[in-house]
Amino acid sequence: MNPQSNITISPIGEFSSELIEAIAGEIKRVFGFPAVSEAVLQDLAFALDQNRNQYHSTLILEQLAANRPTHAIRVIAIAQVDLFIPILTHVYGEAQLGGTACIVSTYRLNEGRGGSNISQKYIDRIVKEAVHELGHTFKLRHCPEHSCIMHYCRNEEDVDRKSDQFCRYCQVMLADEIKRMKIL
């Protein structure tokens, strides 16, 4: 692995250092890469759909990938805005399958929707969804195993129910993809 290789966390908006450090720690634990925090995008106005009052996540992914730092093998944006793709009312995140960019929104994962106090449950949700979306960038698809971190979640309760681990099958697929990429 190139010593410069990392996964870049790009906060869009203000986030606690506690949350960013939790995401970075889990990235290192799960994927084996150091994570650094660096602003890649700052203004998402280009992705705002005025009719829906939501942000089109695919447009954001395109810009993230185009502006990915050269030292980053992947970039994950963390945003406080409400995301959507045209076929769904909202998404917690989106990723380029086998690509270099993904995004997670905290907007719908925050119990109580607001306030400056962040709970451990909120941090756990964001961390799980960050690992889930990064998993897609390593070619992992949604998993039918309900406890697997790659399981598709329709609501906050689904996120809370799934574990923070890959099932055996997804773990093997991830290890194979990382080995194939000759990164680790």
Task: Tell what function each PLM region has.
Residues 76, 135, 150:
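Divalent metal-coordination and catalytic microenvironments
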Residues 10-14, 21-24, 91-125, 141-184:
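Metalloprotease/metallohydrolase-associated module, dominated by Zn2+-dependent proteases
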Residues 84-86, 111-114, 137:
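Short, well-ordered, mixed-charge alpha-helical segments that flank or form enzyme active sites
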Residues 122-137:
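Short alpha-helix carrying the canonical HExxH Zn2+-binding catalytic motif
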Residues 32-36, 60-64, 100-104, 128-131, ...:
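Glycine-rich loops and low-complexity Gly/Arg-rich segments
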Residues 1-85, 90:
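Propeptide-to-catalytic entry region of secreted or membrane-anchored zinc metalloproteases
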